[in-house]
Curated annotation (Swiss-Prot):
One of its GO terms (molecular function) is structural constituent of ribosome. InterPro entries: Ribosomal_bL19 (IPR001857), Ribosomal_bL19_CS (IPR018257), Ribosomal_bL19_sf (IPR038657), Translation_prot_SH3-like_sf (IPR008991). Belongs to the bacterial ribosomal protein bL19 family. This is Large ribosomal subunit protein bL19. SUPFAM superfamilies: Translation proteins SH3-like domain. GO terms for cellular component: cytosolic large ribosomal subunit. GO terms for biological process: translation. It comes from Rhodospirillum centenum (strain ATCC 51521 / SW). It comes from the Bacteria.
Length: 132
C-alpha cells in the first residue's frame, strides 16, 4: 500500500470516528441529517429521498439523493465523509437493477416508484418466535 492510500484511510477513519454510516445503495430511501449554519445558529435539517447514484472514491466518495418537494424534483449531492453530515438513516431498501438511476429524472407519479426489497443482500430477518 502506498503512502497516499494510507493517508487517505487514516483521514476516513478520523472522519467516521463519531458516526456510523449504514450500507446503502442506489434505490434505497435514506434520511440525511445535515448541519445547517444560519448566522450564528447551527441546526440539523433532515433531507429524505431516494439515492439515485453513489460514487465510491475513497475519501472523495459521495452520493446523490433525489426527492420531490412541492411538486418539483430536487437533487442534492452529499460528500460521504463530510463533517456537515450529522447522520444517515436507512428508511427502506429499494429493488433496482441499475447503479445509476438518472432515468427517474424524467418520470413522475407511479412510474417513478421503486419496489421495496425484502430479501437478499443487506436485509436482516427478524425472528418472530415459534409459531404453532
Amino acid at each position: 500500500m502506498n503512502i497516499l492510500q494510507q493517508l487517505e484511510q487514516e483521514q476516513v477513519a478520523k472522519l467516521t470516528a463519531g458516526k456510523t454510516i449504514p450500507a446503502f445503495s442506489p434505490g434505497d430511501t435514506v434520511r440525511v441529517n445535515v448541519k445547517v449554519v444560519e448566522g450564528t445558529r447551527e441546526r440539523v435539517q433532515a433531507y429524505e429521498g431516494v439515492v439515485i447514484a453513489r460514487k465510491n472514491a475513497g475519501l472523495n466518495s459521495s452520493f446523490t439523493v433525489r426527492k420531490i418537494s412541492y411538486g418539483e424534483g430536487v437533487e442534492r449531492v452529499f460528500p460521504l465523509y463530510s463533517p456537515r453530515i450529522d447522520s444517515v438513516e436507512l428508511v427502506r431498501k429499494g429493488d433496482v437493477r441499475r447503479a445509476k438511476l438518472y432515468y427517474l429524472r424524467g418520470r413522475t407519479g407511479k412510474s417513478a416508484r421503486i419496489a421495496e426489497r425484502t430479501t437478499g443482500h443487506g436485509i436482516t430477518k427478524k425472528d418472530t418466535g415459534s409459531e404453532g
